[in-house]
Amino acid sequence: PDTSLSAGEIENYFATYVIEQSAVDLGGIRNTVTVTGRSPNSSTNDISDISDDGDDDDGNTENDPTDIPITRSPALTVNKTAAVVEGSGNSITDLGDTINYTITVQNTGNVTLTGVTIVDDLENADGDNLTLTSGPDWSIADNGSSEGTLKVGETATYYASYLIEASGSDSGSIVNTAIITASSPVGTNDTTASSSVTTTTTEDPSIVVVKTYNIIENGVSGTNPNDIVQYQIAVTNTGNVTLSSINYVDTFTNRESI
């Protein structure tokens, strides 16, 4: 470049900078130029000036850096899916099956997110709390970040599971909600998102009754008057839901009326 400058002359210089993520995270770019020169009667660089930003209305009329503000927009998206693994030996979703949950969390903003945490709420259709069998456990981030950090555009995957118990199947459905919270350069825990998925269970109520007896003899061999007949009634819930208001009606007749 030309290193001389005539009186009244303006020389333009150009420089470029590719915006890096660290600059976005900090909210802007600050640039200052210092120009030095030598006057005709000097053997050293005796003239210098620090650049101004060209804005005399900002409260600083001299030697102020040129600032380029960058708007920081933290954001998250969460997606949750559920897949049922048959465990009860039938073709319906019910007691004994396992629900496997996959939760993906993506940084859809323009700043790095840290302190990423997940809270996974599990309830039945009545609003009663249920307990996950496992998870939620962090698995991987697709751009190499460790657990708790998400680069811009990066997606992390979590897994959880629930073995369906009576408290889950009796109500007719199971609702799972993942709530993600993260911190951005703008603030602590300032970025949240959530996603829910509902799994419907199928009721298949049934009952089996088996009645057996035992004769207690009164001292005389064989079945005779005054012997005692002791009945045992076994009632088995062979369905997949809890049964209530069980009622017993025992009809007793002699053989001639059978």
Where are these regions (language model features)?
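Exported/extracytosolic protein signature
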Residues: 1-258
